Amino acid sequence: MNAWKQLRAILLLPGMVTVVIPATIIYFTGISQPRSIVIGSFFILVGLALMILTNRLFTTVGHGTLAPWNPPQKLVVRGVYQHVRNPMITGALCILLGEAIFFGSWWLLAWFGFGLILNLIYIPLSEEPGLVRRFGDDYLQYMQNVPRWIPRLTPWEGLSEPAELKQEGHRNE
């Protein structure tokens, strides 16, 4: 995997959502005194850990990036994806919530709420149907066994070798 492709995907998507826009909000609205540095830092660190783990899995297992123009070519159902279907979004939302708590900013809390609502709508209505088209029955089986948002306590061991995309965008039979 080309390191530049990976870095570009990280900087453009989660970097924009979790760093550039919150920094702009703080710049224009002012910084309140940090009310809860420990709690805010905890959420930020959990979010960063999830983002790093999921990006690494997309590269090493999925042979792609989080960017829509270079998505994983294999369905990723290892690591944190054995517990929950959307750990990358969970990581980004943890970072946004942590920033709101850390800075004591209602504007950043509103930005977190916007991101949460957007993903609660987008994931089931757009992303999941697209993944069903790309990976077929394997993704349907994954959806039935791994929750969208609340992690399972035990890892799901259902797919030993997940689907890989054909050139025309359908899973291998």
Q: Which residues are covered by each model-predicted region?
A:
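Membrane-anchoring alpha-helices and their flanking helix-loop junctions
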Residues: M1-Y81, T90-E173
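Extended, alpha-helix-rich binding/interface surfaces that flank or overlap catalytic cores
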Residues: N86
